[in-house]
Amino acid sequence: MDSFQNEKKLYGLIGYPLGHSFSMEYFNEKFESENINAEYMNFEIEDIGDLMEVIAEYPNLCGLNVTYPYKEQVLPYLTSIDDAAKAIGAVNVIKITRGPKDNDVELRGYNSDTIGFMKSVEPFVNENRKKAMVLGTGGASKAVTYALRKLGIEVMLVSRQKSAATHTYDELTKAMVNEHKIIVNATPLGMFPHTDTCPDFPYRFLGKSHLCYDLIYN
């Protein structure tokens, strides 16, 4: 029992690529400063199908963060999903619970993206900012959209692909941009190593009253 309690717990991040991520450095410094017997690793897997191999190879792995492009792709591999994550349709946190047998593993998915985004954007929401444009339609976009609607903000989705639920960048007019005072980049554009890329958005229509939020932190 003592050896089990003293065993260093392992946590990590799955995604591809991971060259832009500072999660490993951040969490390992946090574990050390808080005197937590744990380690954080990056698992740069090229296919989500490699997830179970990672879990089998590291028996002390207790949890994972999930980043692009697997926040939606990981769903079929989960044993259960938190209600909020289920409503969002994307997961960025996995809790790993192991039973007595090697193949007895339970994976429960959660979404903390929506919590972090909501807390950071809420102080800037006012009566003049009741409509938002969210650029992108992936897992990050779903979390952002969920959070904005929780704050009572109307959301317009913008994508390169036209659909019944989205507008394309070519369709955006000055009046539409002016009406939506919150603009969120939830696309992977700008992510390392392609840091000079950005959405094909009509930036000339932005004004001083707009709140622009970029999820790409590098």
Regions found by a protein language model. Give the residues of each.
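Conserved beta-strand elements of the Class I
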Residues: G12, K131-L135
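Glycine-rich Rossmann-fold phosphate-binding loop(s) that bind the pyrophosphate
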Residues: Y16, G136-G138
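Short helix-loop-beta connector
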Residues: V125-K131, G207-K208
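N-terminal Rossmann-fold NAD(P) dinucleotide-binding loop
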Residues: S141-K142
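NAD(P)-binding Rossmann-fold cofactor-contacting core
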Residues: K150-Y169
